């Protein structure tokens, strides 16, 4: 994105953190290195290699650390694979607290198909110190997803939200939710005992001022609850708390046709085995080759 710019990435980050620290100083607030997606899809959906994404995020994080950032905030991610690259890069290049946030569509998934639960489990497992949901939708639409996010995590694990001010108006005159309506629609979030709440696209200082009043007497921390073992892919989530059906046919032992498919690179045959097991009710696939 900086192609053709006269400034280096490190210069822009240093200037941004310096400006943020000056603005935060009177309030004792923290300055975050706020990082979004790289703007290029990772393989196999795009052309960016996972290792290259890790390297690029590592460069960004190192620049933020050198500039004096107090924490790292990854937000508006829609690809769990890319968020994984970002979190690995942060853990490898700094000891700062890390917040991770994804943006979900109205159906409860990101545009790459990631579920709320898969995000929660993966981000926590990769070392994020807090997780949340931001952008795309307003408070009312995000609330059911925020509730699922909180339920997928231990009670003492920090959760936050940053909804939009609704949707942008077609005439370009702003967003369809006023500060007063935003504050009213944020009241149900009090029951989630959030670590933090804020606003994303379309929100202004007027929104945040009223939001502060909504949460002024709230304390973070949800009741403790038992956390079952879970398995997940970006698009599915399985709780292992009883009988879990595992498909084990993706295994060449004693299967001549499968062995032939492996030798010939016949991935269609192997994929058929996976699909047939899924359609038969398998919740998990054991790939043993």
Language-model region placement:
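Domain-level signal for soluble alpha/beta catalytic cores
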Residues: 1-289
């Amino acid at each position: 994105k900086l192609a053709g710019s006269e400034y280096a990435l490190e210069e822009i980050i240093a200037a941004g953190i310096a400006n943020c620290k000056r603005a935060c100083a009177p309030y004792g607030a923290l300055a975050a290195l706020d990082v979004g997606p790289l703007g290029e899809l990772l393989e196999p959906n795009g052309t960016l290699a996972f290792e290259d994404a890790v390297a690029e995020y590592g460069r960004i994080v190192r620049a933020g650390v050198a500039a004096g950032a107090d924490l790292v905030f990854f937000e508006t991610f829609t690809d769990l694979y890319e968020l994984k690259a970002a979190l690995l890069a942060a853990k490898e290049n700094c000891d700062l607290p890390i917040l991770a946030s994804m943006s979900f569509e109205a159906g409860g998934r990101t545009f790459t198909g990631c579920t709320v639960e898969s995000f929660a489990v993966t981000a926590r497992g990769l070392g994020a110190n807090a997780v949340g949901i931001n952008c795309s939708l307003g408070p009312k639409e995000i609330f059911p997803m925020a509730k699922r996010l909180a339920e997928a995590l231990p009670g003492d694990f920090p959760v936050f939200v940053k909804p939009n001010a609704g949707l942008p108006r077609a005439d370009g005159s702003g967003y369809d939710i006023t500060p007063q309506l935003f504050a009213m629609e944020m009241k149900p979030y009090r029951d989630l005992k959030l670590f933090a709440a804020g606003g994303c696209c379309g929100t202004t200082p007027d929104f945040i001022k009223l939001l502060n009043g909504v949460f002024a007497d709230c304390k973070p921390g949800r009741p403790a609850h038992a956390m079952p073992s879970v398995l997940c892919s970006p698009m599915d989530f399985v709780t292992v708390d009883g009988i879990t059906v595992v498909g084990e046919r993706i295994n060449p032992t004693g299967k001549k046709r499968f062995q032939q498919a492996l030798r010939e690179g016949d991935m269609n045959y192997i994929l058929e085995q996976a699909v047939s097991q899924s359609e038969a009710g398998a919740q998990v696939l054991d790939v043993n080759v």
